[in-house]
Amino acid sequence: MLSKIAKLPILKRLIPSLAIRILKIIGKNRGYYSIRGIDMYLDFLDPIDREIILYDEFEKPEIEFLISEIKRKKLNYFLDIGANCGYYSFKIAEKIPNINIFSFEPNPEAYFKFSKSLLKNSRLSNKIKLENFGLSNENNKLKMQSMIKFGYAQTGGSTVIKNNI
């Protein structure tokens, strides 16, 4: 219901703005949200998490494309590189019966949220292996930085700021 109301043009900006202000005041911006039957630990102040919470069909065309390609090519493995909160991993685990998913997330905060969601979704967690590091074509250590927006570090949109640390 909230996702339908939130799509109305006048409310599309107003609802998130009001919710952010209220949640900052009461300090309850994090928690479990049921996203089409998947319990995800999300933070309403994080822009990607907020999109997932408010708009039921977050990145639906992209996910449908991936699912159709996995089925068409009869793939057994899916690599979710830069998995963030695990949304893609969970959606694919839910739709593809015999898939093995390897999810990689170097950001400690995003990894934490994904880990908590895995614990709540035992029916899907046996398909997903989560690792707390990034992937590259080189064996190297890199320093990453999250983008800061409105005083809040976003878990999506991190960038490498220093090579060979």
Can you say where each PLM-predicted feature lies in the sequence?
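Membrane-proximal basic amphipathic "stem/tether" segments
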Residues: 1-42
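A short alpha-helix capping/helix-coil boundary motif
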Residues: 9, 41-46, 69, 94-95
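Ser/Thr- (and often Asn-) enriched beta-sheet segments in non-cytosolic proteins
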Residues: 30-34, 83, 141-143
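Glycine-rich adenosyl-binding loop in Rossmann-like folds that engage adenosine-containing cofactors
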Residues: 36-64, 122, 126, 131-165
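SAM cofactor-binding core of SAM-dependent methyltransferases
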Residues: 55-137
